[in-house]
Regions:
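Helical substrate-recognition/capping region of FAD-dependent monooxygenase/halogenase enzymes
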Residues: 1-167
Length: 167
């Protein structure tokens, strides 16, 4: 009898680090989660249930913000402004916030995942305030040590090819 092959185990995600659609780093980071890298998975908790980080992303563009306390009103306003990004081909583009924290936080209207083992923060070289812009295919587009909606909007425009000459 023929053996079945799990083809999913034979594939390796591509690093798209050379793509002009990525936004180069302006802040210092360590590790593999560079713009263009496929996201690393890690165990998390969502609504008190064990889960995996990658199951929480991939529903569109997302901004993953690391926080140890509820975000300030300014940061919440920046996250809200990201929900209504400039349209692409006359279609609205939303950026969905995802908050990663080491302890439970209640932030109305936003998904909060608890990094119970600290592995998400470690793998993403994150500290409170670090933010990542993620593609729908679970690749890193850009990352910063602090969230800035203007930088995030510029990175999204670049990812959508809405800027002049990409270099």
């Amino acid at each position: 009898a023929r053996k079945l092959v799990n083809s999913g185990r034979l594939s390796v995600p591509s690093f798209l680090t050379g793509s002009v659609l990525n936004t180069p780093d302006v802040d210092a980071f360590e590790g593999n989660m560079v713009p263009g890298a496929p996201m690393d998975d890690a165990p998390v908790q969502v609504n008190g249930q064990d889960a995996w980080l990658l199951n929480q992303v991939g529903k569109g563009f997302q901004v993953m913000l690391f926080a140890d306390a509820p975000p300030s009103p300014e940061v919440l306003a920046q996250l809200a402004s990201c929900r209504s990004a400039p349209p692409c081909a006359n279609e609205p583009v939303q950026v969905i916030p995802l908050i990663v924290t080491s302890s439970p936080l209640n932030i109305p209207g936003m998904t909060v995942v608890i990094d119970t083992q600290g592995l998400v923060a470690k793998r993403y070289d994150a500290q409170p305030g670090t933010s990542y812009l993620l593609r729908p295919d679970q690749h890193v587009l850009a990352r910063w040590r602090s969230l800035d909606s203007a930088q995030l909007q510029a990175a999204l425009a670049r990812a959508l090819g809405q800027v002049g000459e990409l270099a």
